[in-house]
């Protein structure tokens, strides 16, 4: 799972 803000 990759989260980019």
Curated annotation (Swiss-Prot):
<keyword id="KW-0964">Secreted</keyword>
<keyword id="KW-0027">Amidation</keyword>
<dbReference type="GO" id="GO:0005576">
    <property type="term" value="C:extracellular region"/>
</dbReference>
<feature type="modified residue" description="Histidine amide">
    <location>
        <position position="5"/>
    </location>
</feature>
<keyword id="KW-0878">Amphibian defense peptide</keyword>
<dbReference type="GO" id="GO:0006952">
    <property type="term" value="P:defense response"/>
</dbReference>
<protein>
    <recommendedName>
        <fullName>Electrin-4</fullName>
    </recommendedName>
</protein>
């Amino acid at each position: 799972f990759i989260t980019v803000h």
